[in-house]
Amino acid sequence: MNVAVLQFPGSNCDQDALHLFASGLKVPARYVWHKDTGLGSADLVVVPGGFSYGDYLRCGAIARFSPVMRAVRDFASAGGLVLGICNGFQILCEACLLPGALIRNSSLEYRCLTCELAVEPSTPSFGPATLGPTIRMPIGHGEGNYRIDPEGLARLRANRQVLLRYASNPNGSLDDIAGIRNETGNVFGMMPHPDRAFERFHPSQDGLAVARAVLATRFPEVLKRAG
């Protein structure tokens, strides 16, 4: 089992993401540069938080054209696991690997706080049965306001694609959405940071269970190991 953590100019959570998997879950993890055209032997690709390309034009709008994203699209199309965190979620939406878009917070302010999140029953490994009904993870973003058209929202609900909802909405996100997955259940995106919620000195350690639940989508033995 191997994890590939992407690095773009402006990424600033790549080290946190790698540390979450390498130290938190003891899974081999390595960096993949934005100019690379392959992902090696990755079993999970993590698109980390930060400000890729300085957030110029629009969050994630330039990163989607990076050479490595062609490899990520091919990887996801073949059923490979992909996790986008914060700016990574924005990039996955821009790349059409996840539906919808993330726009400026309704307050027009950058929000940085720990949020209580309701866990939705989305997949066998990602739901209240494995994570509990609520978890706590921090956010840090100016553009986390999730938007999608009414038909798209209906599909998200019908297919149980919503992973997490804010208990107290910090950014105006439609339907309190904090995280979603694609229809086939192998691409995950969320604005809260599991990579900032797993060390003993963090306000919460729930991020470790979130990362484990994503991995367990393809590798259920990860959950057994945790038990």
Cite the ranges covered by each PLM segment:
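Structured helix-beta-strand junction loops
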Residues: 78-79, 158-160, 183
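A glycine-centered loop/beta-turn motif at secondary-structure junctions
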Residues: 177-201, 210
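Pocket-forming structural segment of enzyme catalytic cores
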Residues: 97-176
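Active-site-proximal beta-strand elements of phosphoester/diester hydrolases
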Residues: 3-4, 136-140, 188-192
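Beta-strand-turn-beta hairpins that frame and shape the catalytic cleft
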Residues: 1, 132-134, 182-187
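N-terminal beta1-alpha1 cap of cysteine-dependent amidohydrolase-like domains
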Residues: 1-85, 94-99, 104-110, 118, ...
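Active-site metal-binding loops of divalent metal-dependent hydrolases
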Residues: 50-51, 88, 142, 194
